[in-house]
Design a protein with these regions (language model features):
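Short beta-strand-loop/turn "lid" adjacent to the catalytic site in phosphate-handling enzymes
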Residues: 54-118, 136, 269-273
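ATP-binding/phosphotransfer module of carbohydrate and carboxylate kinases, centering on a glycine-rich
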Residues: 1-53, 58, 176-322
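Short, acidic Gly/Pro/Ser/Thr-rich loop/turn segments
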Residues: 17, 69-71, 142-146, 201, ...
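ATP-dependent carbohydrate kinase catalytic cores
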Residues: 97-129, 219-231, 235-241, 246
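Short beta-strand segments
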Residues: 11, 63-67, 101, 134-142, ...
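Active-site nucleophile and cofactor-binding loops and adjacent substrate-binding regions
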Residues: 35-37, 79-80, 99-106, 125-128, ...
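Glycine-rich phosphate-binding loop of actin/hexokinase-like ATP-binding domains
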Residues: 121-125, 129-190, 272, 279-285, ...
């Protein structure tokens, strides 16, 4: 296989799909196109639309990441009725090599190669170590996390479905919110609060408790909270951010990411420069006897919208080099 192969990259989120080409391990940014998932019934149609705009897809490999679980080369999107298989991806791309990974795995494969300008520091660290374990946490259409291990010339990024673990409960208010979510969905998962629609749920819950169950879209809640024009939006953001910090702290104690914690996803990026004001760092470090340990973990927001595509390119390049 030539060292500078041409590859097809696909990043399928809960709302949009991005398609691009890579030369070797490098993303060709001019090749990136975005498609709305609701306008297509499957990836094959997306790739046909891409080829119609960019010309025939002629590649030696393809790597697709999805917002959903992947097992034995088969993946189903959590918030979209699409199922993908590596043999089908190879067929659609007309490529001899195809890989299907989780979207957080894609972020993890690319995180070590991001330039400093792609990162916004949220929480400083006194004990960060280059090359150590990293943790990537996504808040967007859904929630998930992935731990990143650098093992010499190999990078291991195990998949997880962290967003479907139970919501943490610390206070009576947390318990009431948990029951509110449970009454709607039957199971109070982290993703039911830590996501765009989750923020809407927190706002709705506050209104329900106040006898005024008005609902707003997440973007409007964030706008009102960050401009200080709505007391309820501010309170919703404080609750959301506190739970976000708590969950990130829990994951950090489980994985000990001395190489840093990296926040990704549309909601995380939109809130990145406001997290400090809503108490994220305090919630992250609120771990009782282990509060001091938390100062070892730096936290950055990844502000590169194409980080997952870059990770796909890196992952596929390693696969094709073996």
């Amino acid at each position: 296989m030539p060292s500078l192969h041409r590859a097809l990259l696909v990043d399928i989120g809960g709302t949009n799909t991005r398609v691009a080409i890579a030369q070797g391990a490098e993303l060709v940014t001019s090749s990136i196109l975005r498609f709305r998932n609701t306008e297509f019934s499957g990836l094959d149609q997306v790739l046909a639309a891409y080829a119609a705009k960019q010309g025939p897809i002629e590649v030696q490999g393809a790597c697709v990441d999805i917002a959903g679980p992947v097992h034995n080369g088969v993946g189903t999107l959590t918030n979209l009725d699409w199922t993908l298989e590596e043999p089908l991806i190879a067929k659609w791309a007309n490529a001899p090599v195809a890989a299907l990974i989780n979207d957080l795995q894609a972020q993890g494969h690319g995180v070590a190669d991001l330039p400093p300008q792609a990162l916004h520091r949220v929480v400083d660290s006194s004990g960060a170590r280059a090359g150590s374990t990293r943790l990537v946490v996504n808040v967007g259409t859904g929630f998930n996390a992935a731990v990143v291990f650098d093992l010499g010339d190999h990078r291991l990024v195990p998949a997880s479905e962290s967003g479907h673990a139970n919501l943490p409960i610390r206070t009576e208010a947390d318990l009431r919110l948990c029951r509110f979510v449970e009454n709607i969905h039957g199971f109070p998962a982290i993703e039911d609060v830590l996501s765009g629609r989750g923020l809407e749920r927190v706002y709705h819950w506050l209104g329900t408790e106040a006898g005024d169950p008005v609902q707003l879209p997440a973007a409007e809640i964030m706008a009102q909270a960050t401009t200080g024009t709505s007391a309820r939006a501010i309170e919703a953001m404080r609750i959301f951010t506190r739970i976000f910090g708590t969950v990130c702290g829990n994951l950090s104690l489980i994985h000990l990411p001395f190489g840093g914690v990296y926040l990704v996803g549309g909601v995380a990026c939109a809130l990145g420069r406001h997290l400090h004001g809503f108490g994220f760092a305090e919630a992250f470090r609120d771990k009782g006897r282990f509060a001091g340990m938390m100062s070892n973990f730096a936290i950055d927001v990844i502000e590169d919208d194409y980080a997952a595509l870059r990770g796909n390119a890196r992952h596929l390049a390693r696969l094709m080099a073996t």
